[in-house]
Amino acid sequence: MTVNVQFRFRSGLPLLAFDNVRLRGSWDEQGHPSNDWTSVPMQRSRDEDGYDVFVIRVPFPDDEIGTHFRWGIELGRPGASSLWAIAGELDDEASSRRERSFDLQQGIGPQTYYLTWIGRLGANRVEKSDAADGIRFSVWAPNARDVLLVLADPAIGYIADDGTGAVATIKMRRTIDGFWIAETGDDDGLLDFDSMVGTPYMYRVTKDDGSLAYRTDIWSLMQIGAGDFDPDGATYHGSPAALDGPQSCSVVCDPKRVVLPSGQELAAEVFWADEFVGGRKLPDRLEDLVIYELHVGALGFGKAAPGTLDDAITFVEHLSALGVNAVELLPIAEFETRANWGYGTSHFFAADQGAGGTDRLKMFVKVCHQRGIAVILDVCYNHFDPDGERAQWAYDSNDHTRNIYYWYEGNPGDYADPRGGYIDNISTGWAPRFDEEAVRQLFISSAAFLVSVCHIDGFRLDQTSSIHQYPVLHADGRRADRAAAFGAKFLKQWTRTMRLIKPQLFLTAEDYSDWSAMTEPSLTGDGLGFDATWYGDFHHNLVEYHGGAQAQLLKNAGFGDKRALTMSSFAGALQTSARSKVVYNQSHDDCGNREGSARTAVIAVNFAPVVGETRAWAEARSRFAAAMTLLSPGTPMFFMGEEIGAQKPYRYNDFLENRENILGEADGDGAGMISCYRDLIALSIHQDAIRSRNIAIPLVHDENRVIAFHRWDDGEDFLVVGSLNDAPFEHGYRLHSERLGDDLWEEIFNTDAHKYGGWNVGNGGGRIRATAGVLDAVLPASGVLVFRRL
């Protein structure tokens, strides 16, 4: 007698280029335990959600009933013939093993590995061969006594605590994994999928203590609200558009269709058919990127409301003219209120409706791709929306230990304040429960959705140090080592899944731990799998860091005296930038939000009014900072507005009042600065030597405020010479380096050129002969020169 066990591998994603998918298990060909794992091919099939599933049935002898077996999935894809597809590690903080297991039993059910949970939760299409496709609603609420699906009045888009706004309630049934499900056929109110598209809904959850709560669908693709108003449970009779998105109803959406601004609907494959035109290609290596950091909400100059994705679509022409090949958006997933940076996400699949929603995000991506610009999204997984009363907070229980989305240690009675068991991590909210697969999959699956459905090219993860290094107990600040360990496990699972889905994704992290594992492989190793980490010390040495010991070159130059500058300290940061770093002269955090910070042009003159001669110095030093960033061996990035010499502070609480007219200034007072940026970007992108990681720094002089560094690759050689001296070296500055040889060097770039607004001090684009490693060159005040070896 045998016991047949079905094994299933489900990605939750369409048309992944997986091949040779194989089941590997700790048994021999007869089904007996073996240390030499067998490998058998799995058959590709299609599940009812319309996605690939790989299936195999394996017979085991019944005399092995009770035996513990282990298994996993191996697959191939273009460029890699054998990849281990189990992304998540065992729920043991001391183990990094990636495998699944079961005890053989008579009548055992299917053993399934879900790479992502797309299609398992939310409102999803159910394909039917003999009728119109149905719909399935599914919600994770393991502690609930009961859950009802509540359909809402689309003219209101909100359900009050007393049920006002509901038009139908539908019973849901519980599954063994804590899901609650309702689908077509369960109730007359559940029609076919297409008929349900656009329907607003919520869940009425009876918690474990019997209390009732209305909850949004955490896996929804759209929240109906596009405004700021929170009824706070009271009856609401206003417009759905005025509601704050996280508090409003979720909406059934069809990810296989795109709604254009005109209202016309297109099949996704039709919409994306002209994604790449005229032979334009996207960059495919992180080192080839020049990243423009953009906050959509800070666009819309001249309007009272925050900027939208429509404004961003218009802005792409500016990005294209500037020459950048990547744009990084501050978080665009659903967040509270309109005027917000977006770092408190409530619904990770839904682009903020106030910004235009998911279909507008797709349009933005397509317009960028048509111009050869990759799109990177900033995502925040270290905390949830702090005002998550209808989202993650206390979703199905008021018991702190059963607050399913949040990490909690011990019992409420252990602390003077019952909240003491939550985890602080130097973010604006408590840490997620990273030891729970449903929580991990919320982050993993939403990222997979953005890649597969919205064609996103990469991600920047906000403050990953908060996930794997900073966790402490809220009660007393004790280290929460288990929370940190599972945070690291989550990050590895996330990067592994992304690499399986799309190996060429750009994966960067804001991380200040200096942990080398951050940029070591995760899919083929035990690292955390990121391409690069943000390098804050580059900015701190180059521009400023209030109270810090770093060089702060521009800040100290801004005093206007002749003090020495620690160019040597910046040289160390410049050298380190070659080690898998994203470097920036400014980021969103550094333009005024942090104490002592401000726009580069303001820091460069020590907060003096940027007018007249002072403006000339502000711009000269700003051009120096731009050149150091864009010519470094790191991956360069700068924040919106730097290219026009923006001066107004960019702060969390008043960015709307301080928006800069970037498009207007580009043809006005910012024309010289933008011309300099444009030429620097072209030099950075089109010269392999500049985009290589190769750097040598043969000359640093703190008293003279001079630095020179060499960039090279495959026969190309460039010498970059920068000076922050307040006077030019008009009679020449002698550079010594054996790297200069006896060769001829041609000046190909000068930040002090008239066309950039400079004083035009330099070598006139001439050629200078080095002799025995010595080269004499005229250096401008607060300027940067680039020479090419001939």
Can you describe what each PLM-predicted range is?
Residues 662-697:
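Aromatic- and carboxylate-lined catalytic core of secreted/periplasmic carbohydrate-active enzymes
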Residues 219-221, 266-286, 295-483, 494:
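Substrate-binding/active-site clefts of carbohydrate-active enzymes
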Residues 139, 203, 294, 319, ...:
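Conserved, mostly hydrophobic/aromatic
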Residues 481, 489-653, 685, 692-695, ...:
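Conserved alpha/beta catalytic core and glycan-binding cleft of carbohydrate-active enzymes
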Residues 762-790:
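C-terminal beta-strand-rich structural cap/linker in extracellular carbohydrate-active enzymes
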Residues 1-8, 93-145:
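Non-catalytic, glycine-rich low-complexity segments
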Residues 230-296, 548-614, 765, 771-777:
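Glycine-rich phosphate/pyrophosphate-binding loop
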Residues 13-65, 75-100, 138-198, 206-229, ...:
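Aromatic-rich carbohydrate-binding modules that target alpha-glucans
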